[in-house]
A protein has these predicted regions:
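Domain-level representation of secreted and single-pass membrane ectodomains enriched
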Residues: 2-181
């Protein structure tokens, strides 16, 4: 029994994780202990949520993570709309790994999950990341339904939404998109 316990202590590395909920229209996120060296065996997820009618724009001002093949050790992963937008690691992109550089990322909807994960061996003093996010208004008037404009006649976009209107002599239907004479 003692051998099993020693084996578990020696070879099992527990990753400590936590989740942060963010609902402000803009903000800053950073790896734990930034700008100092980030800790080993840490996972933190920031769930960023905006009101309907907005997406989320995020860019990195500092990025210095351990480089590993396909970012399997330390990484920042961004997910939105059920899809992985990017998995980032290292300092510069290679043929199999991506670092953010000057790239700006956009969520697919009003939610963005950003997960930072470190393994058990940050031996070279990597300092992690700093990123800034903000809400971006969706221009619903540019969207299409079945390849048709969202409004029959006029579409009016405003922060967080839109409305349709009709030419003089036409009436807007209950669906608030279709116009008839």
């Amino acid at each position: 029994m003692l051998r099993i316990c020693l084996f578990l202590v020696a070879f099992c590395h527990v990753v400590v994780s936590d989740v942060v909920q963010l609902q402000k229209m803009y903000g800053r996120i950073a790896s734990p202990d930034f700008p100092n060296v980030y800790p080993n065996s840490k996972e933190r997820t920031w769930n960023i949520t905006m009101p309907q009618g907005y997406t989320i724009r995020i860019y990195f001002t500092h990025f210095n993570l351990e480089l590993s093949y396909q970012c399997e050790y330390d990484y920042v992963k961004m997910q939105s709309g059920g899809e992985v937008l990017a998995t980032l690691c290292g300092h510069e992109s290679t043929d199999t790994e991506e670092a953010p550089g000057d790239k700006t990322f956009h969520s697919l909807d009003n939610n963005l999950a950003v997960t930072f994960r470190s393994d058990y061996s940050n031996e070279k003093g990597f300092t992690g990341f700093e990123a800034f996010y903000s809400a971006e208004d969706i221009d619903e008037c540019q969207q299409r339904i079945d390849n048709e404009p969202i409004c029959d006649h006029y579409c009016h976009n405003y922060l967080g939404g839109f409305y349709c209107s009709c030419h003089i002599g036409y009436v807007l239907h209950k669906n608030k998109r279709t116009c008839t004479a």
